[in-house]
A protein has these predicted regions:
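Hydrophobic, Leu/Ile/Phe/Ala-enriched alpha-helical segments that form helix-helix packing faces
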Residues: 37, 78, 127, 154, ...
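Structural signature of tandem-repeat unit edges
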Residues: 29-72, 82-98, 108-121, 131-148, ...
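Residue-level detection of beta-strand scaffold positions
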Residues: 18, 97, 101-102, 124, ...
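Periodic small-residue-enriched repeat registers in elongated scaffold domains
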Residues: 77-81, 102-107, 126-130, 153-157, ...
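Generic structural signal for hydrophobic residues
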Residues: 74, 100, 123, 150, ...
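Short, low-complexity N-terminal tether/leader segments at secretion or assembly junctions of large
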Residues: 1-30
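Short, aromatic/basic amphipathic alpha-helical patches
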Residues: 214-227
Length: 235
């Protein structure tokens, strides 16, 4: 091997060592960050705005976040994560939580929220201004304890097509899906089926365009006839 060839070989090895060290350093920084964010030295019962303004595209913390306490607030956890597209369904489990208001507010790149437990006392503005949101795996209303718990929940959700499951009975006023002009037939039916039969004088609002695309007049009349105690408004 010539001297020139040896020099080339040394340079290649140095680059490989440098890249390996850089990767190791990045992993150390990653671990250090999450050791701070998810410190186990204290028992955490407050998650408000935990990831607000983060620039991640995929919500994937190092350790799972499991919440099973009615006093734990998760309001604004992902507030204004403008690049966030979705989250890891295996890393978030909100079995029981206090307010989840503004949970994903202003996540303007959010495309889907997988089916995760999300049982909270308040979903006000939870998905507001999520312009690109297409699908939500689960809408759990079983823990809501305020009449305004669904106010502005889907404000400006223009792209929303499907809510995979509605869990519990809706007894809140102000559920408004007027912006969701692409909402599918199955979601209409799930929501109407979930409206409480025991409460009177409340209103749920849908998009006239979405309704026209999903139902014949006869089908719509039959559906709303199942909940005569509710006003189903079309805008």
């Amino acid at each position: 091997m010539s001297i020139a060839e040896k020099l080339v070989k040394i340079a290649e090895n140095e680059q490989a060592v440098f890249e390996a060290g850089k990767a190791e350093g990045a992993r150390e920084e990653y671990d250090r960050l999450w050791d701070i964010v998810q410190s186990k030295s204290i028992e955490r019962n407050e998650f408000m705005y935990m990831f607000a303004y983060w620039a991640w595209e995929y919500g994937d913390p190092k350790e799972p976040i499991v919440i099973d306490g009615a006093g734990t607030v998760i309001a604004g956890m992902f507030y204004n994560c403008r690049k966030l597209k979705t989250i890891n369904a295996h890393k978030f489990d909100f079995v029981k939580a206090n307010s989840a208001s503004n949970l994903f507010t202003d996540c303007r790149s959010l495309e889907s929220v997988p089916k995760i437990n999300l049982c909270s006392t308040n979903l006000t503005s939870a998905y507001s201004n999520c312009y690109k949101l297409l699908t939500i795996g689960l809408l759990d209303v079983s823990g809501l304890n305020t009449i305004a718990g669904l106010n502005s929940t889907f404000y400006a959700c223009y792209a929303l097509e499907d809510i995979g499951e509605v869990r519990g009975q809706i007894s809140q006023n102000g559920l408004n899906l007027r912006w969701s002009t692409k909402l599918n037939k199955a979601t209409f039916i799930r929501i109407v089926n979930a409206l409480s039969p025991e409460i009177n004088g409340l209103t749920v609002t849908f998009s006239q365009t979405a309704k026209n695309n999903a139902f014949t007049d006869a089908e719509w009349a039959a559906l709303i006839g199942t909940k005569p105690n509710w006003t189903l408004s079309l805008v």
